[in-house]
Amino acid sequence: MAVSSRTTVGRMRTSLLLLALASALTACSGGGGGGGGGGVDAVEKSTTDHAEVAVPVAVRALEADEVKASGQWQSCMALSWRYEVFASMTAPEGDTATQLEAVKSALVDDGWTDDTQVDDHVTLTREDATVDVAPSPARGPGAWTVKVQSSCADYDGDAKDRVENDEARTIELDR
């Protein structure tokens, strides 16, 4: 059976296309190395470091107290993982829009980039972290939450076991 040059070219194109697709997928996934360019420990430290800066800024802007914070790995759409520091606090009741603007201004002054896209909370970014601040009336009068999150990433092996079985731990934040 003779193979025409058209068939050979078609197979070569298909092979090249598959190689290009495999390369693109590997580049996008980061090779399983973790979010923010690091492993589990580096991502936890970076996110916690960002929280140690952002949460006190929000606390001061809101004149809040009763701050509690914890850190834990969270699933991103059941496909990958991100590390999150979650803080709750109580602030004097006031005009929510004014309070949100005060928080946003304070964080922007501290070097965060405003990335807010919806009402009733503020979202800012810095390097590989996102901070989101919002009132939380379901928690009681004057309740607010601050989430500081790493970007989502895939992990494998021991790192995957660690993030899948992580339990929340208290984080002490200076105010």
Language-model regions: role of each:
Residues 2-16:
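Bacterial N-terminal signal peptides that target proteins for export
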Residues 13-17, 59-66, 135-143:
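Short, intrinsically disordered, charge-biased short linear motifs at domain edges
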Residues 21, 69-70, 145:
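Residue-level signal for mature regions of secreted extracellular proteins and peptides
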Residues 24-27:
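C-terminal motif of bacterial Sec signal peptides marking the signal peptidase cleavage site
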Residues 29-33:
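Bacterial signal peptide processing site
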Residues 35-85, 165-175:
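Compositionally biased P/S/T/G-rich terminal and signal peptide-adjacent segments
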Residues 90-97:
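Short, surface-exposed ligand-recognition loops at beta-strand->loop->(often short) alpha-helix junctions
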Residues 99-163:
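Extracytosolic low-complexity repeat regions of secreted or lipid-anchored proteins
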